[in-house]
């Protein structure tokens, strides 16, 4: 179920930077986020702590814990803007390729860890 999450930095960014066509929403001009693409359902913006040049996040505007929780219509909108964002990143960065990564759950973050194994960045 979608819900804004006050502790989620992505919900804060999405809430501060509403799509221009959404009514009754005001943009927070103090938010330093650089928006790459924006629709009523999804937003793409440069990461504030980038791992690489032009590290861009493409997210649904509503909060979902897991990709499996995202409704099909919302996932389709995220997928619709993704190719344009990838083209823009490649053009601006001069890169010949890109990665699209989607992490789900605590174990998806490096290093992953559970009772059976431990994986560090060095092992990858």
Positions of the model-derived regions?
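HIT superfamily nucleotide-processing domains
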Residues: 1-124
């Amino acid at each position: 179920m979608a819900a804004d999450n006050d502790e989620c930095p992505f919900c804060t960014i999405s809430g501060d930077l509403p799509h221009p066509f959404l009514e009754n929403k005001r943009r927070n001009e103090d938010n330093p986020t650089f928006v790459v693409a924006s629709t009523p359902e999804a937003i793409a913006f440069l990461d504030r702590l980038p791992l690489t040049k032009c590290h861009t996040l493409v997210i649904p505007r509503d909060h979902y814990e897991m990709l499996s929780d995202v409704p099909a219509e919302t996932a389709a909108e995220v997928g619709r803007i993704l190719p344009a964002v990838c083209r823009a990143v490649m053009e601006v960065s001069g890169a010949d390729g890109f990665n699209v990564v989607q992490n789900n759950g605590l174990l998806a973050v490096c290093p992953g860890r559970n009772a059976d194994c431990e994986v560090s960045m060095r092992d990858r």
